[in-house]
């Protein structure tokens, strides 16, 4: 069953729904973890433990999940989000303080960390040069979705 059309316009850079038809591409998930320090010589043998389907791993609610590209700028690098990263955004989640969200602010879409201080919401970047956006008490903050995963191509050629 195809995903219903979203009720709000998609922001520029949105690739579109993450779910159109149920597709499965299960790839081998190795039973060994990749060491990011010195490798263990005891792990000379490894096998396939399971199959990994990125749809199942990354998408909790297919009809409410969208892919979006992080725009230029480095305001979110402190949270591990770099320009050009692919963001997986779930519109069905209720945003909680600490979540990375896509919010509608001053007529545009922004990717920020949602925080609450003294009963008021703030949108924080992950860069010290960018001051938090303090949401005035008379303004309703519209959260378009919650960023649940990010992807970045490591090979630069």
Q: Where in the sequence are the language-model features?
A:
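Short, solvent-exposed secondary-structure boundary/capping segments
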Residues: 41, 120-126
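Short, compositionally biased
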Residues: 97-121
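Flexible, small-/acidic-enriched active-site or ligand-binding loops
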Residues: 128-134
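Short, positionally conserved secondary-structure boundary motifs
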Residues: 1-77, 108-109, 116, 142-144, ...
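Hydrophobic beta-strand signal
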Residues: 88-89, 102
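Structural motif
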Residues: 84-85, 99
């Amino acid at each position: 069953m195809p995903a219903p059309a979203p009720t709000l316009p998609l922001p520029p850079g949105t690739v579109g729904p993450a779910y159109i038809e149920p597709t499965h591409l299960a790839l081998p998930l190795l039973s060994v973890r990749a060491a990011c320090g010195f490798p263990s010589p005891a792990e000379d043998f490894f096998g396939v433990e399971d199959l990994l389907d990125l749809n199942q791993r990354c998408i909790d609610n297919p009809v409410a999940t969208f892919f979006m590209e992080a725009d230029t700028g480095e305001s979110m690098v402190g949270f591990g989000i770099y320009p050009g990263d692919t963001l997986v955004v779930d519109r069905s989640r209720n945003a909680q303080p600490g979540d990375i969200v896509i919010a509608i602010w001053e007529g545009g879409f922004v990717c920020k960390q949602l925080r609450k201080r003294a009963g008021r919401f703030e949108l924080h970047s992950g860069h010290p040069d960018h001051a938090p956006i303090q949401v005035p008490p008379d303004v309703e903050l519209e959260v378009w979705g919650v960023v649940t995963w990010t992807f970045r191509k490591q090979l630069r050629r």
